[in-house]
Amino acid sequence: MSHYAIILAAGKGTRMKSDLPKVLHKVSGITMLEHVFRAVSVIEPAKNVTVIGHKAELVREVLDGQSAFTMQTEQLGTGHAVMMAEEELAGLEGQTLVIAGDTPLITGESLKNLIDFHVNHKNVATILTATADNPFGYGRIIRNENGEVTKIVEQKDANEFEQQVKEINTGTYVFDNKRLFEALKNINTNNAQGEYYLTDVISIFRENGEKVGAYTLRDFEESLGVNDRVALATAEDVMRRRINKAHMINGVTFQNPNATYIDVDVEIAPDVVIEANVTLKGQTKVGAESVLTNGTYIVDSTIGANTVITNSMIEHSVVEKGATVGPFAHIRPDSMLKEGVHIGNFVEVKGSTIGENTKAGHLTYIGNAEVGSDVNFGAGTITVNYDGQHKFKTQIANNAFIGSNSTLIAPLEIGDNALTAAGSTITDNVPADSVAIGRSRQVNKEGYAIKKPHHPSQQK
C-alpha cells in the first residue's frame, strides 16, 4: 500500500523574530525544511505535499521540483493546514505521514519505524510520541486503564492531572489517508486557541471505535520542534554531535568534537585529523590523512589527501593532494592549488591556478593568475590585476623565479625559467630564460648621512 507525506511549512514563526520563514532557518548547513524532507524521503512516499503560506515563494524554492505544494493563506491551526492538502490526496488509498517542517532532528529511521508500526498494528491513526522530563508546552498523550490512547490534550486545555503526564505528542502522525480527510470535516475551533486542532481527529476516531496507536521515540531529542532561537541553537548542538560522532565512527580524529563545526553534507575520508575550532561548510570534501589545524575555515571546497591546512580560510576552491596551506592564508573562490603546492604565511590567492610544487611562502597576493609548476614567489610579491574597472590576467610559466617584493602589472606573461629581480616592477612580458630588472639603479652618496638627524654627530 502506498505512503504519502504532508509537510507543514506555512507558519511565520513569530518567536524567531525574523523576516525569514521559520522552516528556512538553517541547522548544520541546510534549512530545517530540507532536514525534514530528507527524513521523509526514507519512507519513499508516492507523493509529497508541502503546505506553504508565509512567504510561500521562498519556501517553494527550497523543494521546487521535489514536492507538490498547497497554500494555507490563513494560519488557523494544524488541522486547517492539513485540510489544505486534501486537493492533492483526496480519495487515495494508503497511509499519510503528517509532520511539521520545524523538526530538523527527526530521523528517517524513526519515521520508517513509525510507518511500519502503524501498518503492522492496523491502526487508523498512529501518533509519534516521546517521553519528556519537562513536558510543559507539549500536548499530552492521554491513555485509558488498558494503555490505549484516548485523546491528545494541548497544554492550554489540559487539567491539573493531564499536565502531569510526561508522554508528549511530537506533532508527527500517520493516518489512513481517506479516514483522515473524512474526520477533518468534523473538527471545530471550540478550544483555548480558537484553532482547528489536528489532534481532535484522534478523539473522533476513538469515539467511532477505530484503532489509534502510539509509537514512542527512543531518543527524545528527535522530537524537538524549533520555535525560537534558543531551540534553534539546541538543534544545532544536537546535530553537530550527531555529525561529528558519525565521522569519528568512520575513522576521523577530532581533537575536540565539541568545538568543531561540520555541515551535514561535508565528506571526510578516514585518517583525517581535525583540531579544535575548525569549521567545514557546504559541500566540502576532505581527502584521507589530511590535517586541519586550529582555526581553519573551509567552504564548498575539495581538499586532497595528505594535505595540511594550518589556521587558514579556503572558499569554493580545490586543493590537490600533498599541498600545504597556511598559517593565516586565504584561498579565495575559483582557485586551484595543484599537487605539492605550498601557500604560506599571509598569502592570498584569488581566482588562480597554481601549478605543481609551486611555492609562495609569505606575504604574497596572487590574483587572476595562471601559474606553472615549480615556480617560486619571493616574499612581498603582488600581482596587480585591477585597474579600477577591469581585471587582467598574469601568466607565469614553469620554473620561473619571482624575486621578493616584485610587482607584476597585468596583463603580463613571464616565460619558462625566467627571473624577476627583487624589488622590480614588471610591466612588460618576460621571455623564457630571461632576467627582468625593473628598478632604479642604486646610488650611494658618500658622507651625506652625517647631516641627517639620526647621525651621532647631530645629537646634542
From Swiss-Prot:
EC numbers on record: 2.7.7.23, 2.3.1.157
Cofactor or coenzyme needed: Mg(2+)
Location of region: Pyrophosphorylase: 1-229
Any Pfam family: Hexapep
Pathway noted in the entry: Nucleotide-sugar biosynthesis; UDP-N-acetyl-alpha-D-glucosamine biosynthesis; N-acetyl-alpha-D-glucosamine 1-phosphate from alpha-D-glucosamine 6-phosphate (route II): step 2/2; Nucleotide-sugar biosynthesis; UDP-N-acetyl-alpha-D-glucosamine biosynthesis; UDP-N-acetyl-alpha-D-glucosamine from N-acetyl-alpha-D-glucosamine 1-phosphate: step 1/1; Bacterial outer membrane biogenesis; LPS lipid A biosynthesis
Compartment(s) where it occurs, according to its Swiss-Prot or TrEMBL record: Cytoplasm
Positions with a binding annotation for UDP-N-acetyl-alpha-D-glucosamine: 8-11, 22, 72, 77-78, 139, 154, 169, 227, 332, 350, 365, 376
GO cellular component terms listed in the entry, alphabetical order: cytoplasm; membrane
rRNA processing recorded as keyword: no
Catalyzed reaction equations: alpha-D-glucosamine 1-phosphate + acetyl-CoA = N-acetyl-alpha-D-glucosamine 1-phosphate + CoA + H(+); N-acetyl-alpha-D-glucosamine 1-phosphate + UTP + H(+) = UDP-N-acetyl-alpha-D-glucosamine + diphosphate
Residue sites binding Mg(2+) per the record: D102, N227
Cofactor note: Binds 1 Mg(2+) ion per subunit.
UniProt enzyme class: transferase
Signal sequence, renumbered to the chain: none
Region (Linker): 230-250
Stored InterPro entries: Bifunctional_GlmU, GlmU-like, GlmU/GlgC-like_hexapep, GlmU_C_LbH, Hexapep, NTP_transferase_dom, Nucleotide-diphossugar_trans, Trimer_LpxA-like_sf
Key word tRNA-binding present: no
Coiled-coil blocks: none
Function: Catalyzes the last two sequential reactions in the de novo biosynthetic pathway for UDP-N-acetylglucosamine (UDP-GlcNAc). The C-terminal domain catalyzes the transfer of acetyl group from acetyl coenzyme A to glucosamine-1-phosphate (GlcN-1-P) to produce N-acetylglucosamine-1-phosphate (GlcNAc-1-P), which is converted into UDP-GlcNAc by the transfer of uridine 5-monophosphate (from uridine 5-triphosphate), a reaction catalyzed by the N-terminal domain.
Family the entry assigns: In the N-terminal section; belongs to the N-acetylglucosamine-1-phosphate uridyltransferase family.
Protein name: Bifunctional protein GlmU
Organism: Streptococcus thermophilus (strain CNRZ 1066)
